[in-house]
């Protein structure tokens, strides 16, 4: 299809399956996971049209944004950054999103002549 729904991603350490102590590393891990999911489905990060970030420590807003910006080459998708209670496995960030594949232009009736 032309739409991909990305379920909640956490930035967990692959060895421990817990959030790392380093906030920047966790932000990179969560965004790397989103990118892997998006690209494995044949989409690009720039196909994301909506992203929701749940954050258990809202003081990490600027840190997350600094990492987040590096994953997009065009404009940014619409985004909500929501302060939340405790997330599973000690995570500070949970990310979900919606990607829509850009459709190739179709030839109109004049092109069929």
Regions found by a protein language model. Give the residues of each.
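Short, polar/acidic, helix-capping and beta-turn segments at strand->helix junctions
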Residues: 1-113
